[in-house]
Structures are given as C-alpha cells and as structure tokens.
UniProtKB/Swiss-Prot annotation:
Family: Belongs to the amidase family. GatA subfamily.
Pfam families for the chain: Amidase
Name of the protein this chain belongs to: Glutamyl-tRNA(Gln) amidotransferase subunit A
Gene: gatA
SUPFAM superfamilies documented for this protein: Amidase signature (AS) enzymes (SSF75304)
GO molecular function: ATP binding; glutaminyl-tRNA synthase (glutamine-hydrolyzing) activity
HAMAP family xrefs: GatA
Keyword check for Kinase: no
Any one biological process term the GO annotation gives: translation
Active-site positions on this chain: K75, S150, S174
Amino acid sequence: MHAKSLTELRAALAAKECSAVELAQHYLKRIDAARDLNAFVHVEPELTLAQAKAADAELARGAGGPLTGLPIAHKDVFVTRGWRSTAGSKMLANYESPFDATVVARLQAAGMVTLGKTNMDEFAMGSSNENSAFGAVKNPWDTNAVPGGSSGGSSAAVAARLAPAATGTDTGGSIRQPASFAGVTGIKPTYGRVSRYGMIAFASSLDQGGPMAQSASDCALLLNAMAGFDERDSTSLERDDEDFARHLGQPWAPGNDAGKPLAGLRIGLPNEYFGDGLADDVRAAIDAALKQYEALGATLVPVSLPKTELSIPVYYVIAPAEASSNLSRFDGVRFGHRAAQYGDLLDMYKKSRAEGFGPEVKRRILVGTYVLSHGYYDAYYLQAQKIRRIIANDFQEAFKSCDVIMGPASPTVAWDLGAKGDDPVQMYLADIYTLSVSLAGLPGMSVPCGFGAGANAKRPVGLQIIGNYFNEARMLQVADAFQRATDWHKQVPQVPAGV
C-alpha cells in the first residue's frame, strides 16, 4: 500500500479497497517502525485516527474531494492546533499553537489526514537536518548520509514511504535540495503563491511553502489545495485560482507526435551550473536526464546566469538580516523557552535566548544584526538587495530564449552525517544552484533522475527545473513527461525492512 502514489491511493479509497482509517493505521505503523530515521518529531495517533474517521464518514456520504482521506505529514515549521509546533528548536519545544497555519487548514479542509510533524533544521536554518534540537535525520537511502535540509524530515518521510506526501518550506533551497538528496519530487512555488500565515518565519522575503511527494502529478494535486490568496498574509499574491494539473499528460504544443510530446520545448542550460564544483556522478545523471528530454522532443539551449556565484554572499546577508529581526520575538516573555534562573529582565532575555537557540541560529542572528547595524546597512544589506535585483534580471534575460531552465539541484549527492558540521561555509556552498532562484522569487522543483556512483551509488540525484513567475503548471507538465518516461521517482529504499 505504501508504494502507491497519492493518485493511486485516491483510486484505492474510491474503490473501497481500503478505508482512510486503515490507510492512516498503515502509515502510523511504518512511522513507528522507522523511528531510527528520526523523520518525525511529533505523532499523535488519536488525533490522526479521529481525522481519518471523519474522512471515512465524508466518503460514505458520497462527499469529499480528490484529497479526502489521504494522509500527509507537515514540516514542524507550520503551526498546527492540537500538536506541538517547535520549528526544530528548544526555544519552542513545548509550544502548542491556538490556530492552524493556512497551509495546514487548507489541506485539512480538503480532507487530508495529518500523520504527524516532521523534523527540520532549527528555524529552517540548515542544509542537512543536523541542526535540529531533536537530533539529526538519517537519509533512508543510506543511513550514514544526511537527507538534506531544512525540510529533511519531510524528504526522509516521503522517501521511506512513511507518508505519501509532506509539506515543506523553501527559503534558499530547503524543498529542492532535500528532495534531491532523498529521491523525491518537491516544488517551491513562485514567492507569494502559498500563504505564509502560521509558518514560523525565517526570512520573510524568501520563505515559501510547497509540497513534497512521489511525483509531479501528486505535487500538482497538493498545490491545488495549498495555493491561493490569503488576506492574513501581506505577501500573498491575489491571483485567480488555477488547476496546476491541467497540462499533465498533454503535449507541449498541440499536434505533437505522441513519441515527441515535448517538441517545441526549449530547455535553457546555464553555463554556470555545469562548471567546476559539479561532481562527476551528478553531472552524469543530469546529462542522462537531459538526453531523455531530447528524446521526448525538447531542444537544449545554452543560457547564462552570470551572477550565480554572487547568490551565496547575497543570500547570507539578506536572510540572516531578516532572521535577526524575526527571531527577536523569542525573548522568554511572551512564549517559548524561559531560563529557570536569572537576575533582572535583561539577564532573563540573555539566558533564555542563549539556552533556547542552537549554534547555527545564533550564528545567523549575529551576522544579521551586524549587517543591519549603523554604518553597515548601506555597505552590506542595501548592496545585497541591489544585486538581488540583478540576479532576477539575469533570469528574465535567460527566459527570452527558453521556456524552462534545468540543471542540478545540488553540486553533490548527500554527504555523510557530520561531514560538514565543522565548516558552515562548506554547507552554505552546497546551495549554490538553488539560492538564486529563491532570491529571484521564481518557482523551482527537483525531480529524481538517478543515483551517484561508487561509494555514493545508493544516494539519489535530483534534476532542478526552474520556471518563470507563475509558470508552475508548465513546470509540472515538463516534470510529469519525464516521469512518464522514467521510473526514478518510483524507486523505494528498503527502510524500514519488513514493514
């Protein structure tokens, strides 16, 4: 049952091959058996089964929609009423929200059943899911490897089939990179497509929620429920609702030959994505995927994104600056961790934050406070915002000669647990191909396209697909065509064994 996609599980529910309760029980059993992966931090079986019973009642009445009764896991950055919402931090270890995030509320309104909350890097700051106050997550393909971050719990849960789908958030690649490392499909929509209300903030001008699942068609199904204007989020974009699955299975252009469904599609290949630093085994998997696209009728076009190398310093000025402001609210007074022993009020602030935040969060708060301080704002933050605009303009120039842009989601496959913990800069460099997309506010996704080589033969590779603003439906069409011709997205690791 767990090998089925959301679409297949929906058909099974409709055919009464199983009930929503049976489905939930099946996944809860798998979650319990795979506790060593540490993908989940909060599971409440009674709440899950109550939601499943309600979904069965809806289905019995002939009501419900395409997602009714289907299970999903939520990244623990989305506040969820009745569940602890921790953002992977000791600061919020016992926090229970009085309301649901818009993403959670919309998926529950669509009838989905919450399986639990997934582990994550603290306050979404990290690329390996080793920065969590609740311990590191293991990659189900190779438990000596990281699952990526910051949505590593979600990527591991979907890869190990502990959940058929999960929510994630992407600030600088935190959906796409873990999707690549864990061999699942994940999409970061255009900034503003999905409401940030109830999503614990890291960097407000970059954070964006999105789905992670087995396939592009599953992601389209989820995005239909997740996306849409929300007046409670000032960054939410007011646009007409659309069906993100409307192009799936359709030719790129009317009249295309069945064997060449993507004839007319122009795929841009940035020179900067295929230079030094790209691992040979990742390059080989990406090249094979691009050959598959050529076989489907697409044309490969060279393009340039000349400011790609500046995306790392720009991101690590802007994101920490916004984080230092957003995280100032966690002071031990209103909610969150409070030190047990302290002197005056200022001492309470200091001790509560020192005890509540982990090393990476403290590092970024210090960097952010520095670049916003008097005398440095113009030199760092303002300059970074100017270069951010240039990066966005580079993409628009590239899209004049192509329909989508492709390349690796990460320069390497997943690295070993602990391999980069002593050098945060090396961790930051791993996001070189995803950061510029986030800075520009563009939609991007990662699609499984192979595995590494040699000692990395069990570690997946992800192909990144980048679209222009609001072009998610076409991106999903392009990804879906690849997945109809290949089976990388159907590969399942043997964890947990025997369940």
